[in-house]
From Swiss-Prot:
SUPFAM superfamilies with a match to the protein in the record: CCCH zinc finger
Compositionally skewed regions (Pro residues) per UniProt: 406-415
UniProt-annotated location(s): Nucleus; Cytoplasm
An annotated Gene Ontology molecular function: RNA binding
Amino acid composition bias (Low complexity), ranges on this chain: 416-435, 459-478
This protein's name: mRNA decay activator protein ZFP36L2
List of residues that carry Phosphothreonine: T238
Region (RNA-binding) location: 170-211
Phosphoserine, modified sites: S57, S125, S490, S492
Keywords: Cytoplasm, Developmental protein, Disease variant, Metal-binding, Nucleus, Phosphoprotein, Repeat, Ribonucleoprotein, RNA-binding, Zinc, Zinc-finger
Length: 494
C-alpha cells in the first residue's frame, strides 16, 4: 500500500517536470520566429496553441503559465488505471530517460534568457549595421562627385605635395588643384582685401598668413565694393596709410556752418584765392562761405555803407541777411537818394574797403576776426526792417509837424562811399555793437550833438530796451555818451 502511494507521487512529480520541459521547448521554437505576430505551430502530440504571440506582451506570460493539457499526458485528474497505465510506460524508461528530460528543464530559464538577449542584441546590431551601411553608401555616392562635399573650397588652392614632388597620393580624389588648369576661382566676400589687418599692422605678424581676409601688403588691396566706402583709412591713422603708400583721402568739406547764435557764419578766402598753410588743416578752414551771408555784417552804423557794399559783392548776388545792409537800403529808399540800387547791385565794388583809409580798421586783419565778430553783432532781418521802418516813420512824422530834420551825425573819415551813391543816414540805435568792441574807432557810436541834453535816465532806459530787443546782455557803457536817438527826442520835446 505504501509502495503504491510513493510510486504515484513520483509519477506526478515526473509528469510536472516533463510538461515544463515541453513548454520551454515550445517557447524556444517561438522565439526563433523572426516575424512578429506569426502563429505558433503546435506540436501534433500536444494541444498547446495560444494563438498569436506578440513580443514583449504580458498576455504571453499568462498563456505560457497556464498551458492547455494534452490528451495523452498524465494528469491527477484522471483516476486509477488510466493514470497507472500511462505512467507505467513512461516509467519504463528508467532513470536514463528522466535524466535526459531533466537537463533541458534545468537549463531552460538560462537558455530562455540567453535566447532573448541574443535576439535583442541581434536586432539592435542589425539596425546599427544598417545605419552604418547606409552612411557608407552615402559617402561613396558623395565621393563620386568630390565637388559636392565642399563646393566652396574645392580646387581653389594648389596641392602642395603635387607642386613640390609632382605626385599626390590622393590622385584624382584630391580636393586641391593639380595645376593651374584645375584651379577654380573662389567666391569671396564683397569686402575681401579691402581693409587693413589690425593684427599684422599692430604687431607685424598674422597667424592666418596668406589666407587672411585683410590687407597685409599694398599689392593685395582690392577695389572697394560699389555703394560703400571702405573704412580702412578711417580705422587706422595716417601713419599706417603712409607706411603702405596709400593715397590719403581728402577730408570731406562742410557746406554749412552754424554759429552759436543760430545764424550761418561766413568765411571768406584771402584775395589770392588760396588758403593759408596754417589754416589748411584746421576744421574751420574747410567750411566754404554760405551764399547768403557776409562777414561784413558786423559793422556798426558808422560803417554800414562799407559793409553793405562788401556784402553785395558776393558771387551769388542775393540780398544779404545782415541788419546794417537792410537799414542802409531802407534809408536810401525812404529818402530817395537812389543809393540802394547801387548798394545792392550784384557787382557793386566796395570802394570803402578797398581804399587806403580802411587799412587800419578792424576788417583789414582778415576773415578770422570778422568771423569772430559776426555772432556778436548780427541781428535778424525782421528786427532790422521793423526798427528801420519805425525810426524813419518817426522822422517823417516830425517833418510833417513842421519840425526841422535832425542833424545827421558826421561820418567817420574811413567810411567813403562810391561816386554814384549818396550817403544815406544810418540808424544807430538798434545796430550798436556791445561795448567790448568799442576800442576800435569803427565800432564807436558817432558823437552826439553838443546841444543835446544829458538825460541819464533816458540813456539807461534806452540801453536796457535795446539790450532786450537784441536778445543779449548789454554791457556797461560809457556814461559820458548818449545815443543820438534820445538826444533828438529830447530836442523835439523841448
Amino acid at each position: 500500500m505504501s509502495t503504491t502511494l510513493l510510486s504515484a507521487f513520483y509519477d506526478v512529480d515526473f509528469l510536472c517536470k516533463t510538461e515544463k520541459s515541453l513548454a520551454n521547448l515550445n517557447l524556444n521554437n517561438m522565439l526563433d520566429k523572426k516575424a512578429v505576430g506569426t502563429p505558433v505551430a503546435a506540436a501534433p502530440s500536444s494541444g498547446f496553441a495560444p494563438g498569436f504571440l506578440r513580443r514583449h506582451s504580458a498576455s504571453n506570460l499568462h498563456a505560457l503559465a497556464h498551458p492547455a493539457p494534452s490528451p495523452g499526458s498524465c494528469s491527477p485528474k484522471f483516476p486509477g488505471a488510466a493514470n497507472g497505465s500511462s505512467c507505467g510506460s513512461a516509467a519504463a524508461g528508467g532513470p536514463t530517460s528522466y535524466g535526459t528530460l531533466k537537463e533541458p528543464s534545468g537549463g531552460g530559464g538560462t537558455a530562455l534568457l540567453n535566447k532573448e538577449n541574443k535576439f535583442r542584441d541581434r536586432s539592435f546590431s542589425e539596425n546599427g549595421d544598417r545605419s552604418q551601411h547606409l552612411l557608407h553608401l552615402q559617402q561613396q555616392q558623395k565621393g563620386g562627385g568630390g565637388s559636392q562635399i565642399n563646393s566652396t573650397r574645392y580646387k581653389t588652392e594648389l596641392c602642395r605635395p603635387f607642386e613640390e614632388s609632382g605626385t599626390c597620393k590622393y590622385g584624382e580624389k584630391c580636393q586641391f588643384a593639380h595645376g593651374f588648369h584645375e584651379l577654380r576661382s573662389l567666391t569671396r566676400h564683397p569686402k575681401y582685401k579691402t581693409e587693413l589687418c589690425r593684427t599684422f599692422h599692430t604687431i607685424g605678424f598674422c597667424p592666418y598668413g596668406p589666407r587672411c581676409h585683410f590687407i597685409h601688403n599694398a599689392d593685395e588691396r582690392r577695389p572697394a565694393p560699389s555703394g560703400g566706402a571702405s573704412g580702412d583709412l578711417r580705422a587706422f591713422g595716417t601713419r599706417d596709410a603712409l607706411h603702405l603708400g596709400f593715397p590719403r583721402e581728402p577730408r570731406p568739406k562742410l557746406h554749412h556752418s552754424l554759429s552759436f547764435s543760430g545764424f550761418p557764419s561766413g568765411h571768406h578766402q584771402p584775395p589770392g584765392g588760396l588758403e593759408s598753410p596754417l589754416l589748411l588743416d584746421s576744421p574751420t578752414s574747410r567750411t566754404p562761405p554760405p551764399p547768403s551771408c557776409s562777414s561784413a555784417s558786423s559793422c556798426s552804423s558808422s560803417a554800414s555803407s562799407c559793409s553793405s557794399a562788401s556784402a553785395a559783392s558776393t558771387p551769388s548776388g542775393a540780398p544779404t541777411c545782415c541788419a546794417s545792409a537792410a537799414a542802409a537800403a531802407a534809408a536810401a529808399l525812404l529818402y530817395g537818394t537812389g543809393g540802394a540800387e547801387d548798394l545792392l547791385a550784384p557787382g557793386a565794388p566796395c570802394a570803402a574797403c578797398s581804399s587806403a583809409s580802411c587799412a587800419n580798421n578792424a576788417f583789414a586783419f582778415g576773415p578770422e576776426l570778422s568771423s569772430l565778430i559776426t555772432p556778436l553783432a548780427i541781428q535778424t532781418h525782421n528786427f532790422a526792417a521793423v526798427a528801420a521802418a519805425a525810426y524813419y516813420r518817426s522822422q517823417q512824422q516830425q517833418q510833417q509837424q513842421g519840425l526841422a530834420p535832425p542833424a545827421q551825425p558826421p561820418a567817420p573819415p574811413s567810411a567813403t562811399l562810391p561816386a554814384g551813391a549818396a550817403a544815406p543816414p544810418s540808424p544807430p540805435f538798434s545796430f550798436q555793437l556791445p561795448r567790448r568792441l568799442s576800442d576800435s574807432p569803427v565800432f564807436d557810436a558817432p558823437p552826439s550833438p553838443p546841444d543835446s541834453l544829458s538825460d541819464r535816465d533816458s540813456y539807461l532806459s534806452g540801453s536796457l530796451s535795446s539790450g532786450s530787443l537784441s536778445g543779449s546782455e548789454s554791457p556797461s557803457l560809457d556814461p559820458g555818451r548818449r545815443l543820438p536817438i534820445f538826444s533828438r527826442l529830447s530836442i523835439s520835446d523841448d
